[in-house]
Amino acid sequence: MNIGIVNDLPLAVEAMRRAIARRPEHRVLWVATDGPQAVELCAAQPPDIVLMDLIMPKFDGIEATRRIMRPERPCAILIVTSCIGANAWRVFEAMGAGALDAVDTPRLGDGAAGDTTKLLLAKIDQIGRLLDAPGSSRLAGAAARGGAGPLIAIGASAGGPGALASILGNLPADFNAPIVIVQHVDRAFAEGMAQWLDGQTRLAVRVAREGDRPQPGVALLAATDDHLRITRAGTLEYTREPAATPYRPSVDVFFNSLTEHWPGRVIGVLLTGMGRDGAIGLKALRMKGYHTIAQDEATSAVYGMPKAAATLGAARAILPLGRIAGELAALARI
């Protein structure tokens, strides 16, 4: 795997070089020390993955991510920066621009068994599996009605935080439908992302806990590296199965559980993201008679998951991001 490093600190660059050198199948393709240089190198010598710092000269990692994700063939981006916790809002902004995940910068002198080195290599491996997954871009009758509004099921990956903030922020305060969100995000960031999204909307947003029931006007965010499912009893549960999937939590797993167990209406929404997770599940929802929506290409940070849904005929409506909240509000009133 060819890897680009974007970081202006020599010690951090050396620590990443040493970590990458422990895997013979990986090599450092180039090193950029600022945002503009990173954008130029991604265009001239596209790597398989970019290790992107957040705080740099000229323009930061958020803007660099945004510009790198604009071309026809964007690069996979992993945020690698110091003090992830202190920079949580920047991490979410970068993920909203298309970054896939985030991890702390490895420490120089950290051996092969060191925690920071292991975490970095594990994240690189995880993204590698995602890139190699089939369909990944390198980049019937209606269901019975429930008493409240329909359950809104949303799946997202790269670019998802920003898209979710836009949709949730444009829903009315009296929106009377439960929302469950499956966003590809490490469990370490789920709580912070829920808090960040909660500040973008008049609705309540929090992480989904084992045994929760979807509630009108509340958005629940999948919060672990396990899959989220709805049970026959109408509660949420986390499960390790299926184990053989590059996506954790998986949008498909959640969508498919709704077709099996949810007694009321469902509106399925598939947003920006790399790969094809959620496309088959969205198709199952549509075949069950539920309304399904996919984000359009023009407004997607990464047109992978919604493209797969469109190809399968899984989406009843393909909409720009700015129209999705209004569509949900209108459908919830029906």
Swiss-Prot record:
GO terms for cellular component: cytoplasm. It catalyses: [protein]-L-glutamate 5-O-methyl ester + H2O = L-glutamyl-[protein] + methanol + H(+); L-glutaminyl-[protein] + H2O = L-glutamyl-[protein] + NH4(+). Phosphorylated by CheA. Phosphorylation of the N-terminal regulatory domain activates the methylesterase activity. Keywords: Chemotaxis, Cytoplasm, Hydrolase, Phosphoprotein. Residues 134-334 form the CheB-type methylesterase domain. Residues 2-120 form the Response regulatory domain. It is an enzyme of class 3 (hydrolase). The active site is at 157, 184, 277. It comes from the Bacteria. The keyword Signal does not apply. The modification 4-aspartylphosphate is found at residue 53. Pfam families: CheB_methylest, Response_reg. It is found in: Cytoplasm. GO terms for molecular function: phosphorelay response regulator activity; protein-glutamate methylesterase activity; protein-glutamine glutaminase activity. GO terms for biological process: chemotaxis. InterPro entries: CheB-like, CheB_C, CheY-like_superfamily, Sig_transdc_resp-reg_Me-estase, Sig_transdc_resp-reg_receiver. Its EC number is 3.1.1.61, 3.5.1.44. HAMAP family: CheB_chemtxs. Belongs to the CheB family. Contains a C-terminal catalytic domain, and an N-terminal region which modulates catalytic activity. Involved in chemotaxis. Part of a chemotaxis signal transduction system that modulates chemotaxis in response to various stimuli. Catalyzes the demethylation of specific methylglutamate residues introduced into the chemoreceptors (methyl-accepting chemotaxis proteins or MCP) by CheR. Also mediates the irreversible deamidation of specific glutamine residues to glutamic acid. This is Protein-glutamate methylesterase/protein-glutamine glutaminase 2. It comes from Burkholderia orbicola (strain AU 1054).
